């Protein structure tokens, strides 16, 4: 008689953590990168073309109102089960914060700076590249940070459609009533969200100069004061 000896090596929680972290980061990085490439031009178009801008903001706003689980389910008939539908859903969820912050950041650029750029003879493309986008950079970075943190949390639902990530141990733990498995996914997901937020806070201080931050805040304060005082002046 033949005896078959099988050596079964169980994965440790460290091994599972490594695999889940890789899958989770893959979902977040791919979807966020695609959203940045698409959303910033959409935000610029929304700021430059008023009528078209309202359509863009309304469209990305509607996507954001769809529940995340429903959006993932809608992707299954189109893309099947696994990573691709999860990436597309996360990509769509990432659009609104980046588009909105790009739009508001460009609108917050003071008219004085724009007039100075025009006086220097800069064409529209150069004004956008050299003046307006640098002034809006802090707002755009804030939108990307918001989208990244949202993605880290929402990506846990990708496990429901076979996307992997930290949601895998969470939902397995719920089915088995195993708190250890639930924490195996919940704790790293929370830590990753905090790390992402901290990383973007550091990037804000490194890539946005202190003088530019002060200029942006002064520009926003000036716009708010004009908005506050204009009705009072008309009433007088």
Name each model feature, range by range.
Residues 19, 26, 42-75, 90, ...:
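Cytoplasmic-entry segments and transmembrane alpha-helices of multi-pass inner-membrane transporters
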Residues 16-28, 76-97, 137, 181, ...:
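Loop-to-helix entry region at the N-terminal start of transmembrane alpha-helices
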Residues 29, 92, 125-158, 180-184, ...:
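Transmembrane alpha-helices
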Residues 50, 107, 183-236:
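C-terminal transmembrane helix and the adjacent membrane-cytosol boundary/short C-terminal tail
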Residues 37-42, 56, 85-114, 144-152, ...:
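Membrane-embedded alpha-helices of multi-pass transport/permease systems
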Residues 1-33:
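Periplasmic/extracellular loop-to-transmembrane helix junction in inner-membrane transport proteins
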Residues 101-146, 170:
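Short cytoplasmic-facing helical segments at TM-TM junctions of multi-pass membrane proteins
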Residues 77, 154-189, 208, 212-217:
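Glycine-rich helix-loop "coupling/hinge" segments at transmembrane-helix boundaries
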């Amino acid at each position: 008689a033949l005896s078959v000896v099988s050596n079964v090596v169980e994965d440790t929680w460290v091994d599972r953590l490594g695999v889940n972290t890789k899958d989770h980061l893959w979902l977040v990085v791919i979807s966020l990168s695609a959203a940045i490439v698409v959303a910033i031009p959409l935000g610029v178009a929304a700021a430059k073309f008023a009528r078209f801008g309202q359509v863009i903001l309304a469209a990305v706003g509607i996507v954001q109102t769809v529940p995340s689980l429903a959006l993932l389910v809608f992707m299954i008939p189109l893309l099947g089960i696994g990573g691709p539908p999860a990436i597309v859903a996360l990509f769509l969820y990432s659009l609104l914060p980046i588009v909105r912050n790009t739009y508001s950041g460009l609108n917050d650029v003071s008219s004085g700076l724009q007039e100075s750029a025009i006086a220097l003879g800069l064409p529209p493309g150069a004004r956008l590249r050299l003046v307006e986008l640098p002034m809006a950079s802090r707002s755009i970075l804030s939108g990307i940070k918001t989208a990244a943190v949202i993605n880290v949390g929402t990506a846990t639902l990708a496990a429901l459609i076979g996307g992997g990530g930290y949601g895998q141990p969470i939902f397995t733990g719920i089915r088995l009533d195993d708190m250890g498995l639930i924490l195996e996914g919940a704790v790293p997901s929370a830590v990753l969200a905090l790390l992402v937020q901290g990383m973007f806070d550091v990037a804000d201080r490194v890539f946005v100069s202190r003088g530019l931050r002060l200029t942006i805040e002064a520009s926003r304060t000036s716009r708010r004061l004009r908005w506050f005082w204009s009705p009072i002046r008309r009433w007088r």
